[in-house]
């Protein structure tokens, strides 16, 4: 196992992800992790991440110096390399020319870390400081136009000024793999088949004959959690799906069919009437979210009580992922509130359940791979993200049954055409937004005054930033024609060309 010490870089999670993609298990801890906890994890190597600070600053982040007594290989990346240079007596100073973006790395000295790596390759830079003078015993392995010491080595201590974890670094994955396999002597034992077997055995032992309540949203995470649990405890799993009437077209039927195919019993609650009555007259986005969240808890509590009377429920399952765990103990300090699944936050006190989080070691892409291993269809696993409050936040203004129907039909057409054109898997997320404006139109010989709808499609890697998708005009025209002809009450279609930032992906 490789342990990554996080110094606050926006790319830290990518280090662990790249290693895991190579079959090497990696964990992330904050730079201030105690040496006792690090020793308990027994890592075969340490990676010191990048970070936004300067090593010569008064309040610079510094790990326990005892990491050097562990006698394991260490790789410093960007700030991590500068920390190593500073610690061992070298000189780091502000660079005359800062480096952000792509640069050409030129290897000048053979090293095990560059085994099988091209002599010249593109790498990703993101630094304002640079190494001016190496500590005694260190040698330079590579340079870039603005960094004479772009990679360094002293025995089993290595430093890289660039970010190998970022996809723009052409040979970055290979370099990280070399460090783990050739320097740290790790083995490729990480994968979803092994994880599934291990986790099912662990869940069987932990839960035994107790019951587990699991809220199913129809999304990837909760479906994977429910499937994993059912493999472990069979009918002691109580999977609950609340239909709040704000789902995509045919969503309830699709989820039910999926669970039937997986042979997992599903308790479906039809709560459309309750949700719509409580949303009546409400236009403000945050109030809509609040009402939906509170109503979900009310409906979920009622269903849980029914099952609780039949036999005490000991556990509540959540789809917490590894990024949520990392964020709760980031370099900024432990969060006051650990992020929870939108469907189960704020449950009443009588639900004094123990928490089960089977996916807490996994990144999102790994959760999808686990789902595939468990037999969940690829089509389902690769669906675009969908907000917890559902279509309520894609209907601007007050929500009504007729507006939901209108949006469902338009959204169905847009997604159907994306799939027909083989574009669905090429965009990160696509959906329709029903605008709270009407516009004048002409249909046949008649004047119309009906709803406008907005098409939204974005490209992204993680949703933190996004750019609008460049869809062909002919494709957009086809979608527009279908919507205005097939969906009653819509006479105008527009396309959103706003990126994030300044906009957000969702409108509300």
UniProtKB/Swiss-Prot annotation:
GO terms for cellular component: cytosol. Residues 190-383 form the GMPS ATP-PPase domain. PROSITE patterns: GATASE_TYPE_1, GMPS_ATP_PPASE. The keyword Nucleotide-binding applies. It is an enzyme of class 6 (ligase). Coiled coil: none annotated. CDD domains: GATase1_GMP_Synthase, GMP_synthase_C. The active site is at 78 (nucleophile), 163, 165. GO terms for molecular function: ATP binding; GMP synthase activity. InterPro entries: Class_I_gatase-like (IPR029062), GATASE (IPR017926), GMP_synth_C (IPR001674), GMP_synth_GATase (IPR004739), GMP_synthase (IPR022955), GMPS_ATP_PPase_dom (IPR025777), NAD/GMP_synthase (IPR022310), Rossmann-like_a/b/a_fold (IPR014729). Keywords: ATP-binding, Glutamine amidotransferase, GMP biosynthesis, Ligase, Nucleotide-binding, Purine biosynthesis. Gene3D superfamilies: 3.30.300.10, 3.40.50.880, HUPs (3.40.50.620). Residues 1-189 form the Glutamine amidotransferase type-1 domain. Pathway: Purine metabolism; GMP biosynthesis; GMP from XMP (L-Gln route): step 1/1. Its EC number is 6.3.5.2. ATP binds at residues 217-223. It catalyses: XMP + L-glutamine + ATP + H2O = GMP + L-glutamate + AMP + diphosphate + 2 H(+). It holds the Pfam family GMP_synt_C. The keyword Cell membrane does not apply. Catalyzes the synthesis of GMP from XMP. Homodimer. This is GMP synthase [glutamine-hydrolyzing].
């Amino acid at each position: 196992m490789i342990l990554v010490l996080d110094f606050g870089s926006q790319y830290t999670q990518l280090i662990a992800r790249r290693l895991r993609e190579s079959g090497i298990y990696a964990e992330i801890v904050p730079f201030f992790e105690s040496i006792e906890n690090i020793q308990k994890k027994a890592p075969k190597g340490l990676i010191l991440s990048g970070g936004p600070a300067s090593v010569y600053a008064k309040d610079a982040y510094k790990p326990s110096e005892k990491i050097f007594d562990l006698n394991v290989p260490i790789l410093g990346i960007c700030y991590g390399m500068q920390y190593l240079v500073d610690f061992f007596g070298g000189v780091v100073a502000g660079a005359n020319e800062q480096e952000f973006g792509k640069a050409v790395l030129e290897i000048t000295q053979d090293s095990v870390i560059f085994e099988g790596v091209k002599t010249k390759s593109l790498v990703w830079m993101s630094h304002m400081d640079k190494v001016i003078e190496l500590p005694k015993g260190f040698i330079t392995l590579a340079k870039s136009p603005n960094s004479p010491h772009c990679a360094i080595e002293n025995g089993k201590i290595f430093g890289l000024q660039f970010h190998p974890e970022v996809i723009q670094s052409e040979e970055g994955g290979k370099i990280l793999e070399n460090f783990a396999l050739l320097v740290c002597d790790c083995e490729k034992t990480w994968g979803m088949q092994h994880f599934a077997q291990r986790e099912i055995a662990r869940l069987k032992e932990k839960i035994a004959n107790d019951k587990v309540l699991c809220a199913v949203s129809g999304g990837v995470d909760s479906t994977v959690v429910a499937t994993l649990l059912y493999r472990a405890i069979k009918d002691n799993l109580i999977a609950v799906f609340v239909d709040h009437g704000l789902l995509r077209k045919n969503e309830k039927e699709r989820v039910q069919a999926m669970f039937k195919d997986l042979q997992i019993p599903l308790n479906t609650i039809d709560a459309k009437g309750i949700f719509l009555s409580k949303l009546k007259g409400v236009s403000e986005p945050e109030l809509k979210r609040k009402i939906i969240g509170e109503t979900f808890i009310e409906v979920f509590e009622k269903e849980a009580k029914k099952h609780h009377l039949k036999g005490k429920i000991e556990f509540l399952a959540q789809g917490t992922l590894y990024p949520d765990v990392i964020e709760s103990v980031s370099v900024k300090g432990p969060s006051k509130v650990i992020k929870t699944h939108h469907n189960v936050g704020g449950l009443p006190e009588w639900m004094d359940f123990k928490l089960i989080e089977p996916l807490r070691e996994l990144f999102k892409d790994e959760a999808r791979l686990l789902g595939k291993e468990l037999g969940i269809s690829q089509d389902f696993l690769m669906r675009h993200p969908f907000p917890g409050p559902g279509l309520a936040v894609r209907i601007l203004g007050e929500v009504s049954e007729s507006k939901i129907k209108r949006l469902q039909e338009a959204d169905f057409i847009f997604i159907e055409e994306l799939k027909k054109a083989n574009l669905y898997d090429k965009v990160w997320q696509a959906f329709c937004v029903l605008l709270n404006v009407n516009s004048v139109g002409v249909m046949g010989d008649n004047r119309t005054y009906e709803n406008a709808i907005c098409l939204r499609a974005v490209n992204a890697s993680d949703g933190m930033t996004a750019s609008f998708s460049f869809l062909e005009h002919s494709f957009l025209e086809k979608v527009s024609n279908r919507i205005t002809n097939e969906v009653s009450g819509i006479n105008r279609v527009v396309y959103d060309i706003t990126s994030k930032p300044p906009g957000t992906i969702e409108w509300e």
